[in-house]
């Protein structure tokens, strides 16, 4: 099984550009797993709400999250990402991702 990974807007590219090469590599490894594996454990993927998921990556003591949705069953659309600094995913980041999701579906009409 292979999913096509696409991005929407510049949110994800801007996030990746803010990271060092090793952190980018780790996130890309997570994306490769997401693209090629039929199921991933909650260590890597967590359902947030309303069809929104987060890809979970750790590198060098830092925790990174990238929001995505499934579109048409096999397309993964990457939204914003952030470096996590607390146990709980901040509501502000979730709300930002939900706004981007609405923007994405609005652009498909």
Positions of the model-derived regions?
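Basic, Lys/Arg-enriched alpha-helical interface segments
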Residues: 1-63, 72-76, 85-109
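Hydrophobic/aromatic beta-strand elements that line small-molecule binding cavities or substrate pockets
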Residues: 66-67
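Residue-level signal for short, function-critical loop segments
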Residues: 82
């Amino acid at each position: 099984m292979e999913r096509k990974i696409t991005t929407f807007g510049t949110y994800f590219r801007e996030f990746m550009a803010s990271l060092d090469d090793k952190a980018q590599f780790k996130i890309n490894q997570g994306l490769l797993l997401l693209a090629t594996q039929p199921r991933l454990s909650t260590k890597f993927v967590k359902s947030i709400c309303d069809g929104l998921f987060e890809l979970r990556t750790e590198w060098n003591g830092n925790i990174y999250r990238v929001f995505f949705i499934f579109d048409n069953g096999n397309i993964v659309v990457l939204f914003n990402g952030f470096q996590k600094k607390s146990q709980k995913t901040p509501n502000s980041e979730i709300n930002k991702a939900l706004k981007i999701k609405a923007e994405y579906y609005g652009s498909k009409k």
